[in-house]
Amino acid sequence: MTKNRILILCLLAGFGMVRRVQAQALDGQQREALIQRAAAFRKQENYGMAIQQLDSILSKNPADAGIILFRGDLQLQNREFKKAVASYQQLIKLNHELTIARINLSYALFMDHHPAKALVYAAEAYARNSSNTNATVNYFNALLWNSRTTDAARFLATVSKSLSPAQRLVLNARLYTTSGNYTKGLANYDSLVRAFPDKNYVKEYAEVLLGKKEIARSETIMKTHDTLFTASEYGAYSQKLRATRMQNAGAEFVLFSDVAKNTRLESSIWYQQGEGRRFRFRYSAGVSTITSAENTRTSAQFGHITVNERFGLAWSGQSDVHLQVIKPEGKDAFSGITGRQTIQYQPNDRRMIGLVYNSEILNYTARLLGSNVRSHNLGYVTHILLSGRTGIFSQGSAGVLTDQNQRYLFFGSLYHLLRTEPTVKVGLNFSALHFSNPAITAYFSPDRYLSTELFADYSTALPHLARHYFQLQAAGGAQQIERLAWEPAFRLQAELGYRSSHFETGLKYQTSNVASSAGTGYKFNWFTYRLLWKW
C-alpha cells in the first residue's frame, strides 16, 4: 500500500511538471506573433525593440536556431557587434546554416575590431561552400580587411567569371582603393553607381569620397540618389558629413625640461576651419617662457597662421607663417617672422614625396633664443608602402644658420605593420646629423652624429572614433657622438585621450636621451595637455 502511494505521488508530481513546462512554452501562434512584432519593429528601424521580441522567444527555447539567426542580423543592424558574435558562434555550435553563420560572424568580428579572426571564418565559409557568392565576396573583403591586397587581387582573378557585373565593379573598386590606387578605385565606384544605383553602393562610394576629403562630390552623389534612402539612413550619412565640416577651437599647454635645467612653459589658443575647403586656415596665438639653469629668462609672444592647400587629389601643400616678439631678460625686445612651406605629390595612397622649406629662430635655451640665431632649411620627405604592411619613410634637409653654421640631416625608417585594430607596428630607424662648425656650443652641433634604433608603435582600435584612446611609441638603440663610443639610446612617447562628438582632451608625455631629439642634446621630459571643442 505504501509503495502504491509513492508511485501515485511521483506520477502526480511528473504530471505537474509537464503542465508547468507546457504553460511556460510558447505555442506556434505566440511565437509567430512575436516574430511579426520583431519584423514590424525592424521595418521601423527600432532594432532594440525587435531584439526584445526575439529574446522573449529565446527565453523559452534558447536553442531556437532560426530565431538566433534573426537576432544576430538585428544585432548587426543595431551595431551590437560583440553580441552578434556570440549569436553566430551559438549558431555554429547548433550546426545551423553554417555558411551564413560563418559569413555573418566574419563581418561581426571585423566590425568588433578583430580582422584576423574575421579572415579565419571567412576562409572557412568559402572553403565549405565555394559556390556561394556571398561567401566569395566576404572572403575577398576579409583579405582586404587584413591588407592582403596581393592575395585579394589573385583571388578576384580566379573567381571573377562567377560574379555579376555589379559585384565585379564593386570588388575592383575596393581592391584599387585599398591598394592605394584611388584614381582607378574612384573610377570604378563612379561606374558602379551609374550602372547599378543600389543604395549600398551609393553609400559606400559617398563614404570613400569623404575619406579622400572630396566632400562636395560625396554630398552630390548622395543628393542625386536621396530617394533610395530612408530618413534615418540619410541622417546617418549627414552626421558623417557634418563631422567633416566641423570647425574647432582649443587650448594647449606645454611643459618641457631637460637634465641641464632648461625649462620651457608655453600656452596657446587656436581656431581652425572645417574641412572641405581648398584653403583651410588655422590661427593660433600664445606666450612662452624659457628659463635656464642660471635663471636666465627669455619670454616670447607669438601668432601663427597655417593654411592647408588642396590643389587636387594628388597635389597638396601647407603654408605656415610664425610671428614672434621676443624679450630677453635685461635686453631690448625684437621681432621675427619665420615660416614653413610644404608641397606634396601623392599619385597613390602608398607613394608620397614632398619638398619642404622652413625657417626658424632657435629656441632651445633662453640665451640662444635671445641671441636671434636663425636657420633656413630646404629638404624632402617621402613615404612609400612596399606592400599593404611594409613601408619606408625618409626625410632629409640641408640648412644654413645666421651664425655661419651649416646643418645636414638624414632620417630613414623601415617598418612593418603587424596588425590593425589595435594597430601594432615595428621597425628600424636610422639618422645622421652633421654641422659644419662643431666648435659652436650654444646648441648641439656635432661634426658627426649617428643613431639607430628599433621601435614599436601601439594605438587602440580606431582612435579617431573611439571615446577613449591610447597611443604608445617606444624605441631603443644606440647613438654615437663624434668618434666616441656608442652609447645606449631610448625614446618613449605616450598619449591618453578622450573624444566625444564635440569635445576632445588629451595628455601626451615624451622623454628621450637621443641627442638629436632636442636642440640641446640632453635627455628631456615633455608634457603637452590639450583641450578642443568642435562645432
Where are these regions (language model features)?
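Mid-chain, structured segments of secreted extracytoplasmic proteins
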Residues: 65-104
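N-terminal leader/linker segments that initiate helical-solenoid repeat arrays
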Residues: 21-66, 70
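Gram-negative and organellar
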Residues: 30, 41, 103-107, 111, ...
